[in-house]
Amino acid sequence: SKDKLHTLYKLLCSFTGGQSIVFCNHRESVDRVAAYLREQKIFFEAYHGGMEQEVRERALYKFRCGSSNVLVSTDLAARGLDIPEVQHIIHYHLPGSEEAYIHRTGRTARWDADGCSYLILHSEERVPEYLTTGVDDYLLPERAARPQPPLWTTLYIGKGKKDKINKVDIAGFLY
C-alpha cells in the first residue's frame, strides 16, 4: 500500500502539466490516498459518494475550472461527468471489469484531445486480459519536482441578491 502511494506520488510528479483523475475502488481508499497527497503537499480534490452533495459539487467545480489539477475519486466520476481537458487517468486500483476500465479511461482524450491511462500495479497484480495490447511500461524518473500549484484559486462566496451583494461588489473588492 505504501509502495503504491509512493508510486502514485512519483507518477504525479513526472507529469509536466494537465489534469489527472486518480481512480480508487473504495471510498476508504480515496480518503487514504487523499491523506497521503495532503502530506506530500499535492493540490487535489477528493470525490466519492460518501461525501455531502455540496462538497462533491465544489470539488468538481474546482477541478473543472483549474483550481485543482488532481481529482481522487471512486468510479462515481467515471460516468456522466463533463470534464474536458483531462490528460491523465490513473487506475490506483484495477477496475473491476472491462466496462469500468472503458468508462474510467473515457474521461481522457475527449474531443480529439490527447490523453494517457496508467495502471499502478502491485508486484502480485497482473495486467487484465482485456488489456493485452497497447500496454507499455512507464519508467518513473528517480527524481522529479513536486507538481506546481494550480494557476487559479476558486473563491466561494455564499451570498447573493438577498444579501444585497452582486458581482460588481466582489470585483471591486478583489481589484
Language-model features: where?
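Conserved catalytic network of the ASCE P-loop NTPase/AAA+ motor domain
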Residues: 12-16, 36-39, 61-65, 81-82, ...
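P-loop/Walker A NTP-binding module and the surrounding RecA-like catalytic core of P-loop NTPases
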Residues: 60, 70-92, 99, 111
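Conserved segment of the helicase C-terminal RecA-like domain
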Residues: 70, 79, 97-138
